[in-house]
Curated annotation (Swiss-Prot):
CDD domains: Tryp_SPc. This is Mast cell protease 2. It is an enzyme of class 3 (hydrolase). Belongs to the peptidase S1 family. Granzyme subfamily. The lineage of its organism: Eukaryota, Metazoa, Chordata, Craniata, Vertebrata. Residues 21-242 form the Peptidase S1 domain. One of its GO terms (molecular function) is serine-type endopeptidase activity. Its EC number is 3.4.21.-. The active site is at H65 (charge relay system), D109 (charge relay system), S202 (charge relay system).
Length: 244
């Protein structure tokens, strides 16, 4: 139940009050050309948003708990309230949720979106590399995540892309999370600072040395954030990418 609560918090409407924030700075416009902004409708009919990232011209990776209907993807965005000439808005043709996804625990929180057409790659819209199966990031590594989530507990969701640097933590650091599996997930942040993912940041990448190692999955007050560990899922990912 505890895991369910903080997964739900990442998707709460802007007035619902999440406990943690991204706590970073505004990103340089279009400096992260792989970033995707997702808009979708939940089962109860509410309009929500998540982050994601482009891993192939026609595929976006995000969190499985960001699934919904009428998923629209905006690429090349910095300010999502403006009609920027760099933006490419593409609807989703098909969703691929990991068959073992568990909403309550947050395990296998990964989803691929096949776009209706390929993105036009350029300096503002581009793919990000994935790790190898043996690329297991170790504690102490400094990485980055980004998103359009809330900038403070009582602040609205950000309209511009923000980024924050996080430290990869060891297993002990995520002991406050009711469900955590070191093989399936990455623990990043700090238990003593407010730098973390938060409301509206789900699905965004954890980037280390220009490689996407994680997917923003869940967070909890006074604990590091949890990211889905991408290297574990590579066989499934490449199987989906090869599908028609």
């Amino acid at each position: 139940m505890q895991a369910l609560l903080f997964l739900m918090a990442l998707l709460l409407p802007s007035g619902a009050g999440a406990e943690e924030i991204i706590g970073g700075v505004e990103a340089k416009p279009h400096s992260r050309p792989y970033m995707a902004y997702l808009k979708f409708t939940t089962k109860n009919g509410s309009k929500e948003r998540c982050g994601g990232f482009l891993i192939a011209p026609q595929f976006v990776m995000t969190a499985a708990h960001c699934n919904g209907s009428e998923i629209s993807v905006i690429l090349g965005a910095h300010n999502i309230n403006k009609n920027e000439p760099t933006q490419q808005i593409i609807k989703t043709e098909k969703t691929f949720v990991h068959p073992k996804f568990q909403y309550l625990s947050g395990f296998y929180d990964i989803m691929l979106l096949k776009l209706q057409k390929k993105a036009e790659l350029n300096s503002d819209v581009d793919v990000i590399s994935l790790p190898s199966s043996s690329d297991f990031i170790k504690p102490g590594k400094m990485c980055w995540t980004a998103g359009w989530g809330k900038t403070g507990k009582n602040n609205p969701l950000s309209v511009t892309l923000r980024e924050v640097e996080l430290r990869i933590m060891d297993q002990e650091a995520c002991k406050d999370h009711s469900d955590y599996d070191y093989q399936l997930q990455v623990c990043a942040g700090s238990p003593t600072t407010s730098k973390s993912i938060g409301q509206g940041d789900s699905g965004g990448p954890l980037v280390c040395d220009s490689v996407a190692h994680g997917i923003a999955s869940s967070y909890e007050a006074k604990a590091p954030a949890v990211f889905t560990r991408i290297s574990y899922y590579l066989p499934w990912i490449y199987k989906v990418l090869k599908s028609k």
